C-alpha cells in the first residue's frame, strides 16, 4: 500500500483512494504501517532523512479547533484543582479539624483519579467518547460543589473523591479524543498545546488558592470550579460531536465490560495508595500498617495481570500492549519521566524554602523557570515529532538533559546565584518538556488503532502512578537523610523534630525562623542542603536508568493518517453520503 493512500480528515467529503477497495463497514481509512501482527518496523535513519514523509494535516476547520479549545479549557479546570488546594489546605484543616485525616484531602482526590481509568477506557469504546467526557466534567463540577459546601472533614474528603473520579475521566478522555482527531504523527503537537494550557492552571493554582483564602474564604477554592465547569460543559456539549460506536443493546455493552478484572485492579490500587499515603506521614515505613497494604496491593496488581491475560474475555489490559517491546519500554520510560518530573516539582521548592530561607510565595516565583518552562518545550517536542516522525532521539536527548540537570541541582547551596538556579531549572524544563507530549504517540506507534482507548488508559494510569512515587521516593530519602544527620546538631530540641521521620514538614522558612541560635540555624541549613544533595544523586541514578532503558525502544514508522471509528461525526456523515452517491452512480 502506498504510504499516502487512504483518506485524510479535511474539509469537505472524504474520498477513498481509488487504488484500494474498502469494505462496506469501513471507518475512516488509513495508511496502516505494516503492523498486522503488531510487529515493529525499524526506521532507517539515512533513508528517512533522505526522503522524509510528509504527514497530511488534520482538519483545521472551526469544528476541529473548537473541540481542541474546549478540551484545553477542560484541562485547565482539572489542572487548576490539582495545585490550588496546596496553599489553602492549612486553613481548611484549621476550620474543619479532622486530625491526621487531612492527608486524604489531596490524596483522596488523587486516588480516585487513577482507580477508574481502565474501566473508563473500556467503557469509552462501548458507549462513545462524548457522553463519558460530559459525565466526567459534570462529576468533577458536582464534587467541587460538595467540597465548597463541606461542613466536616469527612464531607470534604467525600467531595474530593467525587472530584477525583471526574478529574481522572477528564485527563483520560482528553488524550483519547485527541488520538481520535489527529494522526499518530501529529498527536504530540496538539497534546503539547493542551498541556501548555493545563500548565497555566497548575502555575496559577497556588497563587489563586492563597489569594482566595486570604481575601475571601477557602470555599471559593472549590466554588471557582462551578462557572469554569459549567462553561466547559456547554462548550463540549455543542462542539464535541464525534462518531458513536456501532449500535448494540445496553445488555450487550454491559456484558463486554471487564467488571471482575477492574474490581481486582481497583482494590489493589487502593491498597497500594493507602500504604503510600500512610507511610512516613501517619505511620513509620516499617509499620505493618504500611507494609501489609503495600504487599497486598502489589500482589493484587500481579494477580490482575494474570487474570487479564488468562481468564478475561474482554480484557482491559490486553497482552498486545505489555508484550510489545516498544510499547512496554515507553511505558517504563513514561513512569520514570513522571517520577523525575514530580521529583523536581516537589523538591526544588524545598531548596528555596529550607536552604535559601524563602517564603512559600517566593519559592513559587523562583520555580517559575521549572514549572512554566516545561510546556513551551512540550509544544516544540510535538512539532519536531510531526516534522521528522522520530521520537527515540528526542527521548534520549530529553532524558540525558534530565540526568544532567539532577547532577547540577546537587551543586546548589545557600550561596548559589540566581543565574545558577534559574538556568539549572530551565535546563531541566527543556529535557522534561521535549518528552512529555511525545511519550503517548511513541507508546501507540507499534499498536493497532483498535487499542487506542485501552492503551491510553494504561498510559494515563502509569503516569498517575509515577506521580505517587515521584513524591514518595524523594520524600523518604530526604526524611531518612535528615534523621541520620540530626544526631550531629548541637540543639537536641531541634534535632527531635528532624529525626522523627517527618523532616519534610519542617523544611520551611517558618521552622528556620523559629531557631534563634545562629549556629544551630546554620547547622540545620547545612543538614537540609546535604540531605537534598542525596535526593538529587538518587535522581541522577533514576534518570540515568531511564536513559539506558530508552535504547530498548524501536523507531516505528508513525502513521500519518487516521484509522478510527471515533472521528468527527460530520466527516463520517459526509463519507456515508459519498458512498451513497457512488452506489447510485453505479
From Swiss-Prot:
The keyword Chaperone does not apply. Pfam families: MFS_1. GO terms for cellular component: plasma membrane. Glycans are attached at residues 25, 31, 324. Keywords: Glycoprotein, Membrane, Transmembrane, Transmembrane helix, Transport. Residues 1-56 are annotated as: Disordered. Signal peptide: none annotated. Residues 19-36, 46-56 have a biased composition (Low complexity). It comes from the Eukaryota. GO terms for molecular function: transmembrane transporter activity. It is a multi-pass membrane protein. MFS-type transporter; part of the gene cluster that mediates the biosynthesis of UCS1025A, a member of the pyrrolizidinone family that acts as a strong telomerase inhibitor and displays potent antibacterial and antitumor properties. These compounds share a hemiaminal-containing pyrrolizidinone core fused with a gamma-lactone, giving a furopyrrolizidine that is connected to a decalin fragment. Belongs to the major facilitator superfamily. This is MFS-type transporter ucsD.
Amino acid at each position: 500500500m502506498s504510504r499516502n493512500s487512504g483518506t485524510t480528515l479535511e474539509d469537505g467529503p472524504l474520498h477513498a483512494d481509488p487504488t484500494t477497495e474498502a469494505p462496506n463497514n469501513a471507518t475512516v481509512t488509513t495508511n496502516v504501517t505494516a503492523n498486522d501482527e503488531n510487529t515493529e518496523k525499524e526506521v532507517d535513519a539515512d533513508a528517512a532523512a533522505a526522503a522524509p514523509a510528509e504527514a497530511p494535516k488534520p482538519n483545521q476547520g472551526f469544528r476541529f479547533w473548537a473541540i481542541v479549545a474546549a478540551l484545553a479549557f477542560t484541562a485547565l479546570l482539572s489542572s487548576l484543582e490539582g495545585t490550588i488546594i496546596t496553599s489553602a489546605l492549612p486553613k481548611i484543616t484549621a476550620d474543619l479539624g479532622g486530625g491526621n485525616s487531612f492527608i486524604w484531602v489531596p490524596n483522596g482526590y488523587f486516588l480516585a483519579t487513577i482507580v477508574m481509568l481502565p474501566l473508563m477506557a473500556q467503557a469509552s469504546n462501548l458507549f462513545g467518547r462524548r457522553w463519558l467526557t460530559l459525565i466526567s466534567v459534570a462529576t468533577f463540577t458536582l464534587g467541587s460543589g460538595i467540597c465548597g459546601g463541606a461542613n466536616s472533614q469527612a464531607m470534604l474528603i467525600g467531595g474530593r473523591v467525587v472530584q477525583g473520579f471526574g478529574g481522572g475521566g477528564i485527563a483520560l478522555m482528553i488524550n483519547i479524543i485527541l488520538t481520535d482527531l489527529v494522526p499518530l504523527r501529529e498527536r504530540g503537537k496538539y497534546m503539547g498545546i493542551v498541556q501548555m494550557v493545563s500548565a497555566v492552571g497548575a502555575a496559577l493554582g497556588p497563587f489563586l488558592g492563597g489569594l482566595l483564602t486570604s481575601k475571601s474564604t477557602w470555599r471559593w477554592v472549590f466554588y471557582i470550579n462551578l462557572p469554569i465547569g459549567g462553561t466547559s460543559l456547554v462548550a463540549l456539549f455543542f462542539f464535541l460531536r464525534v462518531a458513536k460506536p456501532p449500535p448494540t443493546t445496553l445488555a450487550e455493552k454491559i456484558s463486554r465490560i471487564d467488571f471482575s478484572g477492574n474490581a481486582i485492579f481497583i482494590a489493589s490500587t487502593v491498597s497500594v495508595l493507602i500504604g503510600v499515603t500512610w507511610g512516613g506521614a501517619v505511620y513509620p515505613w516499617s509499620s505493618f500498617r504500611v507494609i501489609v497494604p503495600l504487599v497486598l496491593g502489589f500482589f493484587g496488581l500481579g494477580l490482575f495481570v494474570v487474570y487479564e491475560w488468562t481468564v478475561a474475555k474482554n480484557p482491559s489490559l490486553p497482552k498486545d500492549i505489555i508484550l510489545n517491546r516498544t510499547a512496554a519500554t515507553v511505558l517504563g520510560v513514561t513512569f520514570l519521566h513522571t517520577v523525575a518530573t514530580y521529583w523536581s516539582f516537589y523538591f526544588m521548592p524545598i531548596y528555596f524554602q529550607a536552604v535559601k530561607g524563602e517564603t512559600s510565595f517566593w519559592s513559587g516565583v523562583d520555580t517559575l523557570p521549572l514549572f512554566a518552562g516545561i510546556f513551551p518545550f512540550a509544544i516544540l517536542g510535538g512539532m519536531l515529532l510531526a516534522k521528522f516522525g522520530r521520537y527515540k532521539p528526542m527521548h534520549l536527548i530529553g532524558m540525558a538533559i534530565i540526568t544532567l540537570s539532577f547532577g547540577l541541582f546537587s551543586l546548589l547551596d545557600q550561596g548559589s546565584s540566581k543565574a545558577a538556579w534559574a538556568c539549572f531549572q530551565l535546563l531541566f524544563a527543556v529535557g522534561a518538556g521535549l518528552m512529555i507530549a511525545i511519550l503517548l504517540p511513541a507508546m501507540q506507534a507499534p499498536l493497532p488503532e483498535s487499542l487506542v482507548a485501552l492503551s491510553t488508559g494504561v498510559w494515563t494510569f502509569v503516569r498517575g502512578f509515577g506521580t505517587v512515587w515521584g513524591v514518595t521516593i524523594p520524600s523518604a530519602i530526604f526524611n531518612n537523610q535528615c534523621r541520620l544527620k540530626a544526631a550531629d546538631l548541637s540543639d537536641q530540641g531541634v534535632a527531635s523534630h528532624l529525626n522523627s521521620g517527618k523532616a519534610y514538614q519542617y523544611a520551611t522558612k517558618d521552622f528556620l525562623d523559629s531557631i534563634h541560635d545562629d549556629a544551630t540555624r546554620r547547622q540545620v541549613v547545612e543538614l537540609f542542603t546535604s540531605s537534598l544533595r542525596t535526593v538529587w544523586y538518587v535522581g541522577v541514578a533514576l534518570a540515568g536508568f531511564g536513559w539506558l532503558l530508552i535504547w530498548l525502544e524501536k523507531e516505528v514508522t508513525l502513521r500519518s493518517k487516521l484509522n478510527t471509528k471515533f472521528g468527527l461525526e460530520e466527516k463520517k456523515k459526509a463519507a456515508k453520503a459519498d458512498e451513497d452517491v457512488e452506489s447510485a452512480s453505479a
